[in-house]
Amino acid sequence: MIYGTGVDIVDISRFQRFVSENNTSLLQRVFTPRELEYCSGKKHSAQHFALRFAAKEAFLKALGTGLRGGVSWQHMEIVNDRLGKPEMLLTGKAGELFAEAGLQKIFLSLSHDGNMAVAMLVLEK
């Protein structure tokens, strides 16, 4: 049974600015060390940061909580499986809320075109 859906679209140039200005404090607040390493190692790092940010926003929309009650950007992490498929890992309060709601699965799709990055996420009970 579907519990919630979330969609978010992000302008990649916003993250290009953060990367160009070397705004590490913002990037470190939003992304986990593993995400920072992954994105920073890519030729188009801003695109990868934007996709991960959109996924986190989509998750918060699907869950219906936003960033409150102790949920942190660091509690949501986007990783890729061995075939490149994106997956969301949850820790901390985000993981607790996911479990408390009786949720079982996260379906995540990421895409980009031109200067836009989009994430679509479905939470299943």
Curated annotation (Swiss-Prot):
The keyword NADP does not apply. GO terms for cellular component: cytoplasm. It is found in: Cytoplasm. Its EC number is 2.7.8.7. Keywords: Cytoplasm, Fatty acid biosynthesis, Fatty acid metabolism, Lipid biosynthesis, Lipid metabolism, Magnesium, Metal-binding, Transferase. One of its GO terms (biological process) is fatty acid biosynthetic process. Its main location: cytoplasm. InterPro entries: 4-PPantetheinyl_Trfase_dom, 4-PPantetheinyl_Trfase_dom_sf, ACPS, Ppantetheine-prot_Trfase_dom. It catalyses: apo-[ACP] + CoA = holo-[ACP] + adenosine 3',5'-bisphosphate + H(+). Its cofactor is Mg(2+). One of its GO terms (molecular function) is magnesium ion binding. Mg(2+) binds at residues 8, 57. Pfam families: ACPS (PF01648). Belongs to the P-Pant transferase superfamily. AcpS family. NCBIfam families: acpS, pantethn_trn, PRK00070.3-2, PRK14656.1. Transfers the 4'-phosphopantetheine moiety from coenzyme A to a Ser of acyl-carrier-protein. This is Holo-[acyl-carrier-protein] synthase.
